[in-house]
Amino acid sequence: MATRVQPSVKVLGASFSQEANPFTAAVELTPMPMLITNPRLPDNPIIFANEAFQNLTGYEADEIIGKNCRFLQGPGTDPKHVEIIHSALEAEQSVEIDILNYKKSGEPFWNRLHISPVKTENGELHHFVSSQLDVTLELGKLVELEKERETLSIEKQRSSDQLQYIVEVANVGFWTRDYTTGEISCSAEYRRIFGLTPDEPVNYDKIIDMVVLEDRITLIQRSQESFATGKSFRVEYRITNRLGQVRWVETRAKALLGKSPALLGIVIDVTERKKAEADKALVTREISHRFKNSMAMVQSIANQTLRNATDPQTANELFSERLRALSQAHDMLLREDWTGTTISQICETALAPFNSTFGHRIRTSGPELVVSDRVTVSLSLGLYELATNAVKYGALSNENGTVQFSWDVLERQGERKFHMRWVEDGGPAVERPTRRGFGQRLLYSVLTGELRAKCDINFAPDGLVIDVLAPMTADVFPQLDSLSDTQAEPV
């Protein structure tokens, strides 16, 4: 909307005649809509309207002459614009303004109105001359442009809000470092990662001091290379933030070169991802280790079985049974996420094949003790072999014999000891074997190698008795620290 008020510079002779005055003739013939009003008459009426004005407004001359210009105003006319015009006329000054007027048809149009006072040589106000220009189309385009600008502004704000939401959800921090001053402008997420307060000033020295020394040189070099080449870079490094937390951070940045060089980038906390990668690597190594151990166990079972078997069929049966026992032991560990198993669970699994026939003759007892995964597999196989031998040669080979397997924790000279006992009773007379079988060799391997135990095997006439006494260490008993003192029986 154009509005301009300025002092008058026009002067007209004292006499004024529409018929004779060349000025009036020029106004009549101009294609610009023109009006002349007489401020010396009440209400400053219109005394002249050219044909162009009549064509613009749709009014005839007799509908115009004698009226005040306000007859063009309507319900949409802004009173503020009317007041601007009135004030200029009162001050005998020129004015230019865009005002909403109405044609005879009721159609509104934007009128670019210019009014100038005409004065005599003595400086007395004689007339007002005004020109009109229909600028509806022009202002309409401006309105459309303004609406488009507002729409773009709204869309820009919406996009900004969406970007901010994405940034918050993605936990990405933004930052800009001034190359000259080292000052850093950063987002809230950036401050969270580095443990900074919301209003705390941030600069390059403060941040670089948080970077772990081993990673600091790499970060500095990559930043310098970016300023030298203008290329972007990506680097992962560790920080010890202001809260004392060690975090893994990933930075992606690019130097903006020019009169005001700066480094613009994002930062992401990748601590959890790094932890997951480390856990994955650990699991991979652990799986490889356990696979090798399992293969070694299978190879040992195969060698021992084939070496002592009397014929291929027997060898195949023994080997299959022992592999089933090994498989059951591994299934048990999988259920416990390879964290170890209680001895009660080991007994239940290893002796399961014998329970249906000899369940009432095989008794187990002892506290809830968890042993490591390595001991779980070996002890399961050992118990399976002892029970198998009891069926073939020992207490379970007749109708009356029994087996008692027990374990407990003893207190000796202020140290905890693990005590385990296998007792066969009521079976045939026992004779010391001329050679060690697979079960006995496996049991010795578990006891002396993995439990670091002292083992006493007694082939008494009434039945086999095995006594084991081992130190209690955390690598064999993972829950040793949580074992209550009440579980230890003084001896």
UniProtKB/Swiss-Prot annotation:
Under Gene Ontology molecular function, one entry of this record is:
photoreceptor activity
According to the UniProt record, what class of enzyme is this? Answer: transferase
State if Transcription regulation is listed as a keyword. Answer: no
Q: Which SUPFAM superfamilies match?
A: PYP-like sensor domain (PAS domain)
Q: Which InterPro entries match?
A: HATPase_C_sf, PAC, PAS, PAS-assoc_C, PAS-like_dom_sf, PAS_fold_3, Sig_transdc_His_kinase_HWE
What is the stated purpose of this protein?
Photosensitive kinase that is involved in increased bacterial virulence upon exposure to light.
Q: What is this protein called?
A: Blue-light-activated histidine kinase
Record the organism. Brucella anthropi (strain ATCC 49188 / DSM 6882 / CCUG 24695 / JCM 21032 / LMG 3331 / NBRC 15819 / NCTC 12168 / Alc 37)
